[in-house]
């Protein structure tokens, strides 16, 4: 009886651990915005003790010579804080991802180890001033690290 009780306790402990892990907030969130720019993302950075990593990704569908020859994509990125302060920067995203005959996909690290100066929801807006024909949109992946 004693041995059965310890197995039962162990099983209950495993179930409790699995439930606790499954109830946590996700550590990574991805979103793709298609259509016309600007591509706007809302990012919850309510935990100022955590750091956040950001990746950008995109897909371009066009003629083979355009897809093949595109080396980088010029992006104008604006960050707006919860208190409505805006920071702007120009970024050149390398287009070194997967290439097929009429399509090119790219994913690149954007910022690593970001610790927000303010807790809350930040807005990231992306414009593509020299967008190639066939740009399908922009994606943002946010990873939270403790």
Predicted regions and their residues:
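Bacterial signal peptide processing site
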Residues: 24-26
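An anionic, turn-rich surface loop/hairpin at beta-sheet edges
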Residues: 89-116
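C-terminal motif of bacterial Sec signal peptides marking the signal peptidase cleavage site
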Residues: 19-22
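Noncatalytic modules at the cell exterior or secretory-pathway interfaces
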Residues: 49-56, 114-129
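Short amphipathic, basic-aromatic surface patches that mediate peripheral association
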Residues: 57-67
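Short coil-to-beta strand junction motifs in C2/discoidin
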Residues: 67-75
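Edge beta-strands of jelly-roll/beta-sandwich modules across compartments, strongly enriched
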Residues: 132-142
């Amino acid at each position: 009886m004693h041995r059965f009780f310890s197995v039962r306790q162990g099983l209950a402990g495993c179930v409790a651990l699995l439930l606790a892990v499954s109830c946590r907030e996700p550590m990574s969130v991805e979103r793709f915005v298609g259509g016309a720019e600007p591509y706007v993302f809302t990012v919850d950075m309510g935990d100022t003790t955590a750091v956040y990593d950001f990746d950008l990704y995109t897909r371009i569908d066009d003629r083979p010579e355009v897809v093949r020859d595109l080396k980088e994509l010029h992006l104008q990125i604006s960050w707006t804080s919860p208190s409505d302060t805006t920071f702007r920067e120009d970024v050149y995203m390398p287009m070194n991802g997967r290439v097929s005959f009429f399509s090119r996909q790219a994913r690149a690290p954007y910022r690593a180890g970001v610790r927000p100066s303010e807790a809350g929801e930040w807005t990231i807006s992306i414009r593509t001033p020299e967008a190639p024909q066939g740009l399908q949109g922009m994606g943002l992946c946010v990873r939270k690290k403790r």
